[in-house]
Amino acid sequence: MQTDSLTDAQLKDQICRAFGLERDSMETVSARAFDLLPGRDLIVWEGDAQTFQFSFVSDSARTILGYPLERWTTEPTFWADTVVHPDDRSEAIAFCALATGRCRDHDFVYRAIAADGRTVVLHDVVKVIIGTRGVASRLRGIMLDVTDEQNEFATGAG
């Protein structure tokens, strides 16, 4: 797992601004994310900050990872138990929980397991939404499929 900050700070600011707009529906936020990153494989999502259960995931999750969308929103630990690669699981969950507990936006790179068994590398950018009591209440994020970039880096190409 990699926890480096985005190299394009402007991109991160645009994404966080888009996700911080409470009046927008997640479908609108999803459309904005796709407009900001044309041609990129990405998943827009929203979930509970305390349980990490997803309440929304964009249709692209099915294309990128192959799981039915319903699993994301009906299985409380789906992301942690199924999506995150077993070798990255404890570190990814701990990092996300620590940053969320501190009410800090964060981003991290981890391996995921697709429904067909493929390994997919995801760069997850997370916006922490603070509730009325000053604690994290919601998480909104975007998962970018960076598998090709990681493979190019590993082989020395690019």
What label would you give each PLM region?
Residues D35, S60, A115:
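Surface-exposed charge patches
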Residues P38, V44-W45, V57-L65, Y110:
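Short, contiguous, well-ordered secondary-structure segments
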Residues R17, D24, D41-L42, F52, ...:
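General secondary-structure edge motif
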Residues M1-Q50, P76, I130, S137-G158:
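PAS-family sensory modules
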Residues Q14, T51-G66, P68-R140, Q150:
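PAS-family sensory domains
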